[in-house]
């Protein structure tokens, strides 16, 4: 990923790295914030790819396999019972494949951010363990 300005670097690299690092904390709060972070990272990556006209990350056999699986999910939702909720869930599963490719692109740019992600996971586990001990001894939940 090549950036022309610091503003572009912030929106297409720093902000997604920040969101990715906060996903463990978002998972504690529930599914909304983590799904929002995944969707934002995927959307920003798609905007970057269309802006730079760089689709080389999508020319990958794993992404093609994921697309085949995604089409299978959609066809399965249509054939089985044509439930609109099932079709909606299957249709928006493509964001996970784009999210994985976005993380690979971020790792290609600079792989030091994975260290911050592991620090966030460590802090998250530490907070959960301390909350578990507090809940065991006092009887009330902090989180």
Regions found by a protein language model. Give the residues of each.
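Membrane-interface amphipathic/re-entrant loop segments adjacent to transmembrane helices
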Residues: 81, 85, 91, 140-141
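Transmembrane alpha-helices of multi-pass, membrane-embedded glycan-processing enzymes
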Residues: 95, 118-131
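Membrane-interfacial helix-loop-helix modules of multi-pass inner-membrane proteins that assemble, modify
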Residues: 77, 127-143
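Small-residue-rich segments of transmembrane alpha-helices in multi-pass membrane proteins
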Residues: 68-70, 98-100, 123-127
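Transmembrane signal-anchor hairpin modules in multi-pass inner-membrane enzymes, especially those
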Residues: 1-84, 105, 111-115, 119-122
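Hydrophobic core segments of transmembrane alpha-helices in multi-pass, intramembrane catalytic enzymes
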Residues: 34-45, 88-101, 135
């Amino acid at each position: 990923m090549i950036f022309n300005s610091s503003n572009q670097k912030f929106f297409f690299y720093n902000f997604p790295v920040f969101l990715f690092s906060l996903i463990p904390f978002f998972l504690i709060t529930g599914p909304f914030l983590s799904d929002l972070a995944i969707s934002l990272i995927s959307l920003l990556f798609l905007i970057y790819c269309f802006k730079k006209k760089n689709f080389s990350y999508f020319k990958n056999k794993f992404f093609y396999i994921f697309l085949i699986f995604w089409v299978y999910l959609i066809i399965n939702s249509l054939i089985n019972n044509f439930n609109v909720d099932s079709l909606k869930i299957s249709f928006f599963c493509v964001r996970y494949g784009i999210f994985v490719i976005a993380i690979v692109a971020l790792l290609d740019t600079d792989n030091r951010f994975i260290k911050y992600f592991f620090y966030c996971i460590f802090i998250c586990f530490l907070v959960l363990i301390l909350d578990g001990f507090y809940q065991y001894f006092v009887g009330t939940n902090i989180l």
